[in-house]
Swiss-Prot record:
One of its GO terms (cellular component) is plasma membrane. The keyword Hydrolase applies. This is Teichoic acid D-alanine hydrolase. GO terms for biological process: autolysis; cell wall organization; positive regulation of single-species biofilm formation; response to antibiotic. The gene is fmtA. It catalyses: [(4-D-Ala)-(2-GlcNAc)-Rib-ol-P]n-[Gro-P]m-beta-D-ManNAc-(1->4)-alpha-D-GlcNAc-P-peptidoglycan + n H2O = [(2-GlcNAc)-Rib-ol-P]n-[Gro-P]m-beta-D-ManNAc-(1->4)-alpha-D-GlcNAc-P-peptidoglycan + n D-alanine. It is an enzyme of class 3 (hydrolase). It comes from Staphylococcus aureus.
Amino acid sequence: MKFNKVKLVIHACVLLFIIISIALIFHRLQTKTHSIDPIHKETKLSDNEKYLVDRNKEKVAPSKLKEVYNSKDPKYKKIDKYLQSSLFNGSVAIYENGKLKMSKGYGYQDFEKGIKNTPNTMFLIGSAQKFSTGLLLKQLEEEHKININDPVSKYLPWFKTSKPIPLKDLMLHQSGLYKYKSSKDYKNLDQAVKAIQKRGIDPKKYKKHMYNDGNYLVLAKVIEEVTGKSYAENYYTKIGDPLKLQHTAFYDEQPFKKYLAKGYAYNSTGLSFLRPNILDQYYGAGNLYMTPTDMGKLITQIQQYKLFSPKITNPLLHEFGTKQYPDEYRYGFYAKPTLNRLNGGFFGQVFTVYYNDKYVVVLALNVKGNNEVRIKHIYNDILKQNKPYNTKGVIVQ
């Protein structure tokens, strides 16, 4: 009888232990669920993705662009010969006095499938996309929807930092925010910007120039917040569609997939494909694909005052060393003494633009290399454009 009582007590203790263990496990799971970092939550389609899916439901691939090249023009013949002899792998577009004079592909868009680069090949423009973000920002300024001197926290109240960050400092890359570290865990722009806010400011870099993708990701989020529209929708409704940039698309737009160049780099075993696996978080700073002709078309139309009035356009394109534009860099591009320049490099692709009032030269490659050497030779030595263009300290009307 005594043995049975002991047995019952043991069974009861075991049962109680099991119940308590189950309760503790359940509590831990509940706590873990509620304490998941919002940066790493599972997400559905982002606003950008939703907009692009809807936009492309009935969209077909754009019409093909023809090759433009006049072998009877000595300078363009020389450019063509130079690109071939230097084993250039990419595409070139050159506008002269507002007209397309050269558009040609070299090498391969996709080495594995043997698909050649053509005027239709669209390249990942990387940081050259900051130019588009800068244009959207400038438009919102002119519409009096933002003040470039306001702190970012005015537009994103949750973006709290140890020191105030004006939008202007983001635009000029002098916010002091720690350099953005991309992660495969971030699945959209929101998660990227929350990660940027969480890392905060490096006090040693505050108010000092430090190029940082994070600055333009935050600006992209500000643009979304102010307009109530996704970055992609802002781009298309305010730039892409009005200026008829039909050979430009975001990285995940299905109708354009067959035209997107693959990026490569040489390593010890030969040519290696660099898979762009973090573009979902790069709205505003590096997930746009363009043909060189579309970029040239964009710049030409800005020069022709189709986006801003002369009063806005001329200082924007030409001033530096002035109160309004103290630095060469502004709104995603550089105004330098002999030219204006924008550039981006991402996942083996490099997209570079040199331009003045006479020429717009766009050179895009998809095998990682020094694009600057080639475009300098074309612009300075063949087209003979190494001469004064913008003057420091001069206010332009």
